[in-house]
Amino acid sequence: MTVEMKVERGLFDEVMVPCYNPMEMIPVKGQGSRIWDQNGNEYIDFAGGIAVSCLGHCHPVMVNALTEQAGKLWHLSNVMTNEPALRLAKKLTEVSFAERVFFANSGAEANEAALKLARRYAADVYGPEKSEIIAFKQGFHGRTFFTVTVGGQAAYSDGFGPKPGDVTHLPYNDIEALQAHISDRTCAVMMEPLQGEGGIIPPTAEFIQAVRELCDKHNALLVFDEVQTGNGRTGEFYAYQGLGVTPDILSTAKSLGGGFPIGAMLTTAKLAEHLKVGTHGSTYGGNPLACAVAEAVVTEVSKPETLQGVKEREQWFREGLAKLNEKYQIFAEIRGKGLLLGAALNEQWQGRARDVLVAAGKEGLLVLVAGANVVRFTPSLVITKQEIEEGFAKLDKAIASLV
């Protein structure tokens, strides 16, 4: 007979590695864009698990896909393939430029695979001297030692000893800096097509075109980290599809599984040939459970009405933020695209994004931050208008408590 353990927030401090600082409440149930904690308190979710819960909590298509697959087959390893993985890979090639897919378990793993492929391709075709990776300041690409080094935030990568070498960080949206530095030694340029953790910073059209042209000029691969922007988040299935450029390699995760862990690296057949048998791998990557859920997510999110709905919801959010700003004069600007939005605080409110987050939580609203000065919103792509209106009423009360 199993005795149910009493779980309280204090248990976290007793048993967990202290690299997180979670809220005091513990959620126990979610439905749509609402969650409930142990005490029955209800919250509106504008955070979406950091841009993960693209269909909200416990969406029927995801629940059905998972439960159906759970009764069939869970795990094999890549000694064998499986039907959900092959179906999902086919779908991803149909909704993107890609011809080949590598499955992993997270965005960091997908980015690690992308970086290894870029280095491998350059070494095979041009020789070992072509190894430089250019990335951008304030970028974020994951927490493995390689990806956190490529990410342009020293706060995440310092303190762990010698870092992987031949990585250069340049200012985002600075064409002249890239022109001055990129060379035939550069094997790849890695970037987010809209910086997330760095403050919700969109690229200029001129910058994104220049990056592609300079990569072509110097035979460098263009790697798009679409872990946060992908799977419908910007109103396109992948953000690159609205930018007029196509990358050589793309990483995707977060919303791909809608809450079930999965990541993928997408690329061309020509490049994929350089990851031969044994050069890279993953025990869990492409497991049937994750791929069955992700297949259901991709099918749902890629529907034209879902993508159009993202654009409509973006306007609802912008209108709500504009009304709050008229009332409280708190935001300097609203940045982002689709349902990856950042409300940048003005000079009087500098450094208080977390204050807004905490106050919102007390009112029953979950939001995020992107640095000290940006309140970030990454809700479900199918959040209802009623849920949005309720959320903004709570945000109004939260800001009022801080004024």
Curated annotation (Swiss-Prot):
Q: Where in the cell is it found?
A: Cytoplasm
Reactions performed catalytically: N(2)-acetyl-L-ornithine + 2-oxoglutarate = N-acetyl-L-glutamate 5-semialdehyde + L-glutamate
Output this protein's name: Acetylornithine aminotransferase
> What's noted on cofactor binding?
Binds 1 pyridoxal phosphate per subunit.
Q: Relay the record's extra comment.
A: May also have succinyldiaminopimelate aminotransferase activity, thus carrying out the corresponding step in lysine biosynthesis.
Q: How does the record describe its quaternary structure?
A: Homodimer.
Residues bound to pyridoxal 5'-phosphate are G107, A108, F140, D225, E226, V227, Q228, T283
User: Which residues are listed for N(2)-acetyl-L-ornithine binding in this entry?
Assistant: R143, S282
What are the entry keywords?
Amino-acid biosynthesis, Aminotransferase, Arginine biosynthesis, Cytoplasm, Pyridoxal phosphate, Transferase
Q: Which biological pathway? A: Amino-acid biosynthesis; L-arginine biosynthesis; N(2)-acetyl-L-ornithine from L-glutamate: step 4/4
CDD domains hit by this protein: OAT_like
A Gene Ontology biological process in which this protein takes part is: L-arginine biosynthetic process
| Positions carrying N6-(pyridoxal phosphate)lysine | K254
GO cellular-component term (any): cytoplasm
Q: Which family does it belong to?
A: Belongs to the class-III pyridoxal-phosphate-dependent aminotransferase family. ArgD subfamily.
Short name of any one Pfam family annotated for the protein: Aminotran_3
Instruction: Identify the coding gene.
Output: argD
The keyword 4Fe-4S is annotated on this UniProt entry? no
